Regions:
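Regulatory N- and C-terminal appendages and interdomain linkers associated
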Residues: 137-197
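Catalytic activation segment of kinase domains across protein kinase-like and atypical kinase folds
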Residues: 18-21, 94-99, 103-152, 158-162
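Alpha-helix capping and helix-loop boundary segments enriched in small/acidic/polar residues
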Residues: 43-47, 69-72, 76-79, 116, ...
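Glycine- and acidic
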Residues: 63-75, 134-142, 166, 170
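Conserved ATP-binding subdomain of kinase catalytic cores across diverse folds
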Residues: 1-69, 110-112, 152-153
Length: 197
């Protein structure tokens, strides 16, 4: 991850201008977003969802294999996505990072968040702090980031409902809170330089 500032002034219609401009360089394990599944679901491209699930299994979730059942594959990938995104949220919160716009196009199913938009690091704990000037309701505020992640994962569950039963989707989503709090504890202890408590 790096930011290279240019000498140019940037004019934008959706943000105060002119502003300083920069190029953001980032690396991600994948660019398969929750929004990718939403689009396929919207157009009822269930065969393509199946292909994408198999692609994820072969390339990004190599510990998850199920040649016999697409249903089991979908359930396991969904569960792993919930755990990985909960882990990312724990790291983000402990670092004091405010993403700015946590929507389904900014979550990879492999657990990373990206396309940070108007991101910031907070100087002191403030759950209502927002990085985006347009976020008047605090939808993407520092304290609501885990809620935004759970909402995005709910959309992923809805996108996979042809393959996963509703009760399994709900049970899987219910694991987010536990995984998130485990991540918070782990990263807090690491940051403080103490053994896990």
């Amino acid at each position: 991850f790096s930011i290279i500032e240019t000498a140019e002034e940037l004019q934008r219609n959706d943000e105060p201008s002119p502003t300083r401009s920069a190029v953001l360089v980032r690396r991600s394990n994948s660019h398969i977003r929750i929004g990718t599944f939403q689009r396929l679901k919207y157009f009822k491209e269930y065969d393509n969802i199946a292909l994408l699930l198999n692609h994820l299994s072969e390339n990004y979730f190599t510990n998850i294999k199920s040649k016999k059942s697409l249903k089991i594959l979908a359930e396991n990938i969904f569960l792993e996505s919930v755990k990985r995104i909960a882990e990312s949220m724990g790291r983000i919160v402990i670092a004091g990072f405010v993403h700015g716009v946590l929507n389904t196009d900014n979550f990879n199913v492999t657990g990373e968040v990206f396309d940070y938009g108007p991101w910031r690091f907070i100087e002191f704990a403030n759950t209502s702090y927002t990085a985006a000037y347009f976020d008047n309701n605090g939808r993407y505020s520092f304290g609501r980031q885990p809620e935004a992640a759970l909402w995005a994962l709910t959309q992923l569950g809805k996108s996979l409902d042809e393959f996963i039963e509703e009760n399994i989707i709900i049970e899987t989503l219910n694991q987010f809170s536990k995984s998130f709090h485990e991540s918070l504890k782990k990263h807090f202890c690491w940051r403080m330089g103490i053994q896990d408590i």
